[in-house]
């Protein structure tokens, strides 16, 4: 008797390397799979070994860090994208298609576009990362394209999702009111969610400022030492910054338009840029 077996092998991962002079943002993906978020922090000159990284978490429990989590599949956390499809379907599962990277006319600036599509519906999403080398700044936004036969309703459409791994997270942000602007608030994040948000349209900075600092691996704020990540929304309007620490101590930061009363009907053939 002959017994034959075949081992299931994962598709080869493609590294998406976005970098400035001193920092790296690294993703990995294979066609038809979710885009995994591997690293944001100090620059990694050779990211190739990260292609084989596995978290050894159970995939059924939604514990892999993904680049742009959508409402659907096994995502149980706050989604970056939540839509109602033309046929009423609420499920969205984004899968990698391709990516391109090019240097813009200013050679200090590199633009990387990562293309995704829903596993079942004709809905496309592009993540656009623009890296400014000397300034050590990476901007990101999403472009949503409707190829379905009817309108798609957008409920949540954040500009970015950033998973971070550290032992502690100290959040610093500014708030205020008339005659007492720019008050400083420090919050040590615990498991669960915290949001900084505004629905005051163009008057957002009168109360909550759409920017933040995150001190990693420390519960005290210092202006002279430590690892700090800064983020800001580069536009005025209703916004929400959502900070969610999960059971594995991973912090996911969502930044973008406030989902409150923000539904948008995207007609067939139209695109929406966050």
Where in the sequence are the language-model features?
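Polysaccharide-binding surfaces and accessory modules of carbohydrate-active proteins
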Residues: 13-18, 23-26, 33-244, 260-262
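Boundary at the C-terminal end of the N-terminal hydrophobic targeting segment
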Residues: 4-12
């Amino acid at each position: 008797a002959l017994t034959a077996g075949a081992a299931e092998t994962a598709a080869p991962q493609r590294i998406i390397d976005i970098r400035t002079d001193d920092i790296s943002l690294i993703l990995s993906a294979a066609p038809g799979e979710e885009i995994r978020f591997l690293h944001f922090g100090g620059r990694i000159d050779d990211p190739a070994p990260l292609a084989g990284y596995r978290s050894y978490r159970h995939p059924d429990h939604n514990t892999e860090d993904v680049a742009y989590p959508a409402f659907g599949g096994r995502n149980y956390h706050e989604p970056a994208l939540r839509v109602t499809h033309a046929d009423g379907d609420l499920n969205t599962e984004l899968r990698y298609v391709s990516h391109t990277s090019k240097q813009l006319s200013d050679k200090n600036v590199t633009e990387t576009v990562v293309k995704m599509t829903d596993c079942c519906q004709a809905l496309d999403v592009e993540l656009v990362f623009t890296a400014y080398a000397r300034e050590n700044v990476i901007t990101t936004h999403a472009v949503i394209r409707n190829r379905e036969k009817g309108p798609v309703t957008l409920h949540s459409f954040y500009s970015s999702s950033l998973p971070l791994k550290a032992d502690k997270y100290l959040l610093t942000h500014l708030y205020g009111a008339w005659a007492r602007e720019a008050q400083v608030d420090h919050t040590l994040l615990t498991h669960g969610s915290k949001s900084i948000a505004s629905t005051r349209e163009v008057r957002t900075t009168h109360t909550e400022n759409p920017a933040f600092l995150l001190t990693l691996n420390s519960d005290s704020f210092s202006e002279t030492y430590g690892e700090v990540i800064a983020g800001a929304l580069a536009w005025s309007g209703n916004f929400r910054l959502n900070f969610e620490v999960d059971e594995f101590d991973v912090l996911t930061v969502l930044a973008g338009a406030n989902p409150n009363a923000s539904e948008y009907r995207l007609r067939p053939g139209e695109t929406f840029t966050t």
